[in-house]
């Protein structure tokens, strides 16, 4: 079973369209080490290896330590949506809540 870090690493690698081999090359790590990070419970990379992975994937190393598993792009979209929502007039907010509740009922 993978760790939260392993899940994040796997998702981000897939979103970037990278194979284990290509990410290993970019980060200067072995393919087998990356596989273990993604798929094993007990792996704890050093700060240097975590930084190399973050650099290769174009994220801050702190991304791997955060609880939120969503990719940075998805989090930014959610934050932008919320900022836009906060600027709406009360009537528009109510309409949007009704629309969202319809989606929730249908899912």
Indicate residue ranges for each PLM-predicted region.
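DNA major-groove recognition helix of helix-turn-helix/homeodomain DNA-binding modules
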Residues: 28, 48-63
């Amino acid at each position: 079973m993978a760790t939260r870090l392993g899940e994040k690493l796997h998702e981000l690698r897939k979103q970037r369209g990278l194979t284990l081999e290509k990410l290993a090359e970019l980060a200067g790590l072995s393919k087998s080490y990356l596989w273990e990070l993604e798929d094993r419970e007990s792996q704890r990379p050093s700060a240097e290896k975590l930084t190399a992975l973050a650099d290769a994937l174009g994220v801050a190393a702190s991304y791997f330590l955060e609880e939120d598993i969503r990719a940075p792009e998805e989090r930014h979209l959610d934050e932008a949506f919320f900022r836009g929502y906060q600027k709406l007039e009360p009537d528009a907010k109510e309409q949007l809540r009704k629309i969202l509740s319809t989606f929730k009922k249908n899912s």
